[in-house]
Design a protein with these regions (language model features):
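Short, intrinsically disordered N-terminal pre-domain segments
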Residues: 1-16, 114-118
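Surface-exposed loop/edge segments in extracytoplasmic proteins
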Residues: 7-12, 62-71
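Surface-exposed ligand/attachment interfaces on beta-rich extracellular proteins
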Residues: 11-31, 42-55, 61, 75-82, ...
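Noncatalytic modules at the cell exterior or secretory-pathway interfaces
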Residues: 33-39, 87-106
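Short beta-strand segments enriched in hydrophobic/aromatic residues
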Residues: 41-43, 98-100, 112-114
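Short loop/turn segments immediately following beta-strands, especially the blade-tip
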Residues: 60-61, 117
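Mid-chain, well-packed structural core segment of small domains
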Residues: 67-69, 79-86
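C-terminal edge strands of extracellular/lumenal beta-sandwich accessory domains
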Residues: 103-118
Length: 118
């Protein structure tokens, strides 16, 4: 039997102002077998002076955030940073927070590939 996978949009492409953060839509995996969560950060022509960070959380209930993985982007003008986090099958709820650096806006987006049946 073939596996069933579902694409999810957690955060549509949007500008994130300097020194601000955004939370992606929570991903409910309580009836799924895990997921890959991908975040894309694009710096503008004026790069941030402090690297933006992406934090992936898992939790046993909706809204619970227990840090699974954190990664930082770069401070290079016009660069694109893609980060992928493998959410294991025991993960029930997934949250992603993107924190921008101190100067200049960036563009952010987040997607997931959910394994729904095996």
């Amino acid at each position: 039997m073939a596996a069933t996978k579902t694409s999810r949009t957690l955060l549509t492409s949007q500008s994130l102002a300097a020194a601000t953060s955004v939370n992606a839509t929570e991903l409910n995996l309580s009836t799924a077998y895990g997921a890959l969560v991908a975040v894309k950060i694009t710096n503008g022509a004026s790069a941030p002076t402090t690297a933006p960070t992406v934090t992936f959380y898992v939790g046993e209930a909706t809204g619970v955030k227990r840090k699974l993985y954190q990664v930082a982007g770069d401070t290079v003008a016009n660069s694109v940073n893609d980060f992928v986090c493998d959410i294991p099958s025991p993960g029930m709820f997934v949250n992603v927070t993107i924190l921008n650096g101190a100067t200049n806006a960036i563009t952010v987006e987040a997607y997931a590939q959910e394994l729904t049946t095996i």
